């Protein structure tokens, strides 16, 4: 028996009314994972034993009727720490690493009686946009297994899109939730920087990283963000802004809502058919009563360059801790301490990670710091100012999530610049610390197109309101890939 076509609300009703137990639901989810895993490759680790034990304990205690997430299984990206469960960040460097603590977001899942059924595949240390940079395996697009899943949270996206799980967590540093959500036709949000604790997230770019949910629908996404949000004393960057009920405005109309469409988001470098799809989506929002007007974000064109200086610099610092001494991989080939460091890191890190460490080390070096890192920080401020000016007059900004639909496997893997440019539309949102969601907005040649809605800081409720209004009046989210029983 499978339950993967049922919403979280429907599953909650079944659990509360004892029509199904948490154990039965978890067993069915594990079957769904097993059945589809060879096709898509979403998981690095499936936590069958732990999940079944947890489900049995929840049944013993009883489902909480007031907690919609009680007994619900989900998957978690493999750079989010899970106590005594392999957490590899898809790297040889951490091939055997089992944390001795849970990330705050994981603690919050357990606190609401959610069941983690596995850890999902990703680009190594979240560096990449296709999930082809994993040390362990390749993840394939749920709609077409000859296409990339997107990245870096590719496994979390395909797990939801293929019907292995209903919900998952990913992380987003420059588009790593939104872009794979777009490529796989699911909902994915990068919350405002500081909305969700980063404690226990294996760090890549500390001023950019944020954990967020993937889901089949907008409401389910909001329901999961309700669980993981909030201030955390263990993360000094987590915000003290009060956490509202993110589902509160779902179902309300968007009459009079002002939405900005930046000309840069539908200009050069954007696939013509993707652009047409987004313009059609903008017209649809207008038909629902929103006011959509063209604006300019003039400095967004520098986003990719700024990001690859700042993110790589932060990564080169964060990844210094992986040296073969305390945990993780250690080389067998050494005669002295220098050899341990050099050979461990040379053998343990993949090509893309090494590339970014070198980029970051270069831009932080004494002769180049002012010319690169400092200047990137100044341009980042200009990008933030652009957003601030637009948000003085508008509620939301809309555009495509990615410039193209999912591309062929191995077609950009050897061309890092082409891969970097694929994050053209998502990166500025991270640089400015803003919330941004990707929702299904149409198809091009049988592949999903994502629409990105960007909000003011901590205005996730407004994003969900508009996203839900669009979703309720279209059927893109109802169309499923063949692997999930759909016709596409």
Swiss-Prot record:
Keywords: ATP-binding, Ligase, Nucleotide-binding, Protein biosynthesis
Listed InterPro entries: Amidase, Amidase_CS, Amidase_dom, AS_sf, GatA
Subunit structure, as described in the record: Heterotrimer of A, B and C subunits.
Major enzyme class: ligase
Described purpose of this protein according to its UniProt entry: Allows the formation of correctly charged Gln-tRNA(Gln) through the transamidation of misacylated Glu-tRNA(Gln) in organisms which lack glutaminyl-tRNA synthetase. The reaction takes place in the presence of glutamine and ATP through an activated gamma-phospho-Glu-tRNA(Gln).
Gene Ontology cellular-component annotations: glutamyl-tRNA(Gln) amidotransferase complex
Protein name: Glutamyl-tRNA(Gln) amidotransferase subunit A
EC nos: 6.3.5.7
Annotated GO MF terms: ATP binding; glutaminyl-tRNA synthase (glutamine-hydrolyzing) activity
Protein's UniProt keywords contain Protein biosynthesis: yes
The family this protein is said to belong to: Belongs to the amidase family. GatA subfamily.
Active-site positions on this chain: 77 (charge relay system), 152 (charge relay system), 176 (acyl-ester intermediate)
Entry's Gene Ontology BP terms: translation
Reaction(s) the record says it catalyses: L-glutamyl-tRNA(Gln) + L-glutamine + ATP + H2O = L-glutaminyl-tRNA(Gln) + L-glutamate + ADP + phosphate + H(+)
NCBIfam families tied to this protein: gatA (TIGR00132)
């Amino acid at each position: 028996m499978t339950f993967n076509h049922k919403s979280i609300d429907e599953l909650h009703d079944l659990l509360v009314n004892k029509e199904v137990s948490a154990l039965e639901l978890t067993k069915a989810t594990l079957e769904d994972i097993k059945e589809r895993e060879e096709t898509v490759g979403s998981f690095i680790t499936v936590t069958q034993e732990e999940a079944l034990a947890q489900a049995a304990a929840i049944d013993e205690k009883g489902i909480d009727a007031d907690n919609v997430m009680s007994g619900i299984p989900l998957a978690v990206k493999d750079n989010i720490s899970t106590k005594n469960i392999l957490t590899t960040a898809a790297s040889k460097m951490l091939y055997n690493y089992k944390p001795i603590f849970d990330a705050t977001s994981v603690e919050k899942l357990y606190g609401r009686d959610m069941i983690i059924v596995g850890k999902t595949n990703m680009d190594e240390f979240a560096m990449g946009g296709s999930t082809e940079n994993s040390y362990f395996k390749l993840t394939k697009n749920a709609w077409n297994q000859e296409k990339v899943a997107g990245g870096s949270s590719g496994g979390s996206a395909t797990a939801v899109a293929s019907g292995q799980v209903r919900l998952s967590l990913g992380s987003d540093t420059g588009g790593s939730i939104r872009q794979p959500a777009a490529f796989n036709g699911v909902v994915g949000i990068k919350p405002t920087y500081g909305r969700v604790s980063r404690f226990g997230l294996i760090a890549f770019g500390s001023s950019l990283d944020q954990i967020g949910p993937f889901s089949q629908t907008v409401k389910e996404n909001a329901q999961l963000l309700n669980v993981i949000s909030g201030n955390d004393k263990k993360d000094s960057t987590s915000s003290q802004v009060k956490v509202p009920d993110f589902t509160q405005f779902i179902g309300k109309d968007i009459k009079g809502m002002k939405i900005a469409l930046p000309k840069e988001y539908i200009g050069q470098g954007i696939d013509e058919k993707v652009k047409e799809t987004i313009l059609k989506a903008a017209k649809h929002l207008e038909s629902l009563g929103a006011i959509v007007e063209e604006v300019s974000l003039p400095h967004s064109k520098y986003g990719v360059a700024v990001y690859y200086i700042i993110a790589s610099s932060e990564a080169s610092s964060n990844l210094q801790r992986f040296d073969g001494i305390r945990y993780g991989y250690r080389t067998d080939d050494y005669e002295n301490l220098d050899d341990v460091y050099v050979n461990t890191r040379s053998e343990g890190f993949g090509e893309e990670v090494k590339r970014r460490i070198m980029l970051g080390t270069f831009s932080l070096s004494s002769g180049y710091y002012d010319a690169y890192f400092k200047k990137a920080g100044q341009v980042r401020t200009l990008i933030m100012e652009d957003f601030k000016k637009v948000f003085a007059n508008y509620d939301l900004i809309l555009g495509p999530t990615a410039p193209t639909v999912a591309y062929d496997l191995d077609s950009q893997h050897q061309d890092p610049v082409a891969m970097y440019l694929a994050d053209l539309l998502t990166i500025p949102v991270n640089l400015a610390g803003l919330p941004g969601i990707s929702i299904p907005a149409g198809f091009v040649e049988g592949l999903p197109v994502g629409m990105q809605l960007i909000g003011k800081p901590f205005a996730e409720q407004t994003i969900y309101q508009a996203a839900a209004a669009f979703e309720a009046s279209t059927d893109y989210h109802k169309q499923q890939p063949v692997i999930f029983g759909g016709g596409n």
